[in-house]
Design a protein with these regions (language model features):
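DNA-recognition helix of helix-turn-helix
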Residues: 124, 141, 147-174
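Structural recognition of an alpha-helix C-terminal capping motif at a helix-to-coil junction
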Residues: 26, 40-47, 51, 62-74
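Short helix-coil-helix linker/hinge
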Residues: 115, 119, 125-133
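Arg/Lys-rich amphipathic alpha helix in sigma70-family domain 2
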Residues: 70-91
Length: 174
């Protein structure tokens, strides 16, 4: 549904939330492994989405879904990293205990991107840094502009262009 089909921005936001809330929750829970923290992440992500609601063209489009899922994923990863930093400060001597406290690894499989890339390309993309992968996917999978990507990821347009250039170079080397 296009934004023009909604009478108010509030009804657009409500429809968008209803459409994606289950997947948003699943992504956040998959990364954080805590339902309460995931709820907070979904709320924080919705605030970011609301601030950028002008970027939503059709709530049922793949572009909108990837926009929403990328914000949720990045917000959850920010919380995870912050939590990890706090835990690192608590641990002073025993590194092996630290590994047991934070767990083995994050389950990124819950964030299945549907950018239209072949399996071979997805394999190459998996070798990139997370931010570079997001930039490549948003640029070539969704046709986002540098400005849209910079707004979404919270970095400058020049940084987007530089990261995109480096990511393409890295992909060419693979």
């Amino acid at each position: 549904m296009a934004p023009s089909e909604f009478k108010t921005t509030g009804s657009l936001i409500t429809a968008l939330f209803e459409r994606y809330k289950a997947n948003m929750q699943q992504i956040a829970t998959g990364i954080l492994k805590d339902v309460n923290e995931a709820d907070d992440v979904v709320q924080d992500a919705m605030v970011k989405i609301i601030k950028n609601i002008h970027m939503v063209d059709d709530i049922d489009s793949r572009r909108c879904a990837n926009f929403v899922y990328t914000i949720v994923k990045n917000t959850a990863l920010d919380v995870f990293r912050k939590k990890q930093e706090e835990m690192e400060q608590l641990v002073t001597n025993d590194v092996s205990d630290f590994v047991n406290i934070i767990g083995e690894e994050i389950d990124f499989d819950v964030f299945e991107s549907d950018y239209g890339f072949s399996e071979e390309m997805q394999e190459y993309l998996s070798q990139l840094k997370e931010m570079d992968k997001d930039i490549i996917c948003l640029r070539y999978g969704n046709d986002f502009s540098d400005e849209e990507i910079s707004t979404l990821l919270g970095i400058g347009p020049d940084a987007v262009r530089k990261r995109l250039s480096r990511a393409r170079t890295h992909l060419a080397e693979i």
